[in-house]
Amino acid sequence: MSGLLFVVSAASGTGKTSLVKALLERVTNLHVSVSHTTRGQRPGELDGVHYHFTTKENFLSQVEDNGFIEYAEVFGNYYGTSQATVKQQLAKGHDVLLEIDWQGAQQVRRIFPESKQIFILPPSQFDLRQRLSNRGTDAVDVIEHRLSCAVEDMQQYVNFDYIIINDDFNKALHDLESVITANRLMLAQQVQRHHKLIEQLITPNSE
């Protein structure tokens, strides 16, 4: 049985990470692939839990070996998703969720055209600016640069299968969970999960 591959993307500050974290607490048999990154480890982050932290040299070596399904350079740091890990999880029948940017989503689409891709949008640019400012970790010019990049990123919404507006967190979470549930109820998935039951039901005199 093969699992489903979901991709969740959004511009910086849209609330994607918080939504994914809450989703994992509500949905069973959904695994998030831990990305590899050359970014420095932040306080409270654990290697192998939040990211697989690595050097630029090691990262680029894995790129040459086709070790990543997708990778991208974001604000001077590299991020990538292990191809072997994702394929192993899917082969075991586990559903996998990738929390990556739109560039990575495009790369995933080329390898896994059947992947279900979800894009999160903020309710307004004003709201997005407030979220970026409330982080309290960046200078004003950095915030303006990130907002400009976010506007460009949001133009990629047309390349995704689902759009969720993160205006109300609980509603957005419900919408995200609904996408997972609806895809699990598709014919192909249900036949895989319940093939014995279905065979019994459609076989005459099989009570």
From Swiss-Prot:
ATP binds at residues 10-17. The keyword Cytoplasm applies. GO terms for cellular component: cytosol. Residues 3-181 form the Guanylate kinase-like domain. Keywords: ATP-binding, Cytoplasm, Kinase, Nucleotide-binding, Transferase. Its EC number is 2.7.4.8. Disulfide bonds: none annotated. It catalyses: GMP + ATP = GDP + ADP. InterPro entries: GK/Ca_channel_bsu (IPR008145), Guanylate_kin-like_dom (IPR008144), Guanylate_kinase (IPR017665), Guanylate_kinase_CS (IPR020590), P-loop_NTPase (IPR027417). It is found in: Cytoplasm. One of its GO terms (molecular function) is guanylate kinase activity. It comes from the Bacteria. PROSITE patterns: GUANYLATE_KINASE_1, GUANYLATE_KINASE_2. Belongs to the guanylate kinase family. Essential for recycling GMP and indirectly, cGMP. This is Guanylate kinase. It comes from Acinetobacter baylyi (strain ATCC 33305 / BD413 / ADP1). The lineage of its organism: Bacteria, Pseudomonadati, Pseudomonadota, Gammaproteobacteria, Moraxellales.
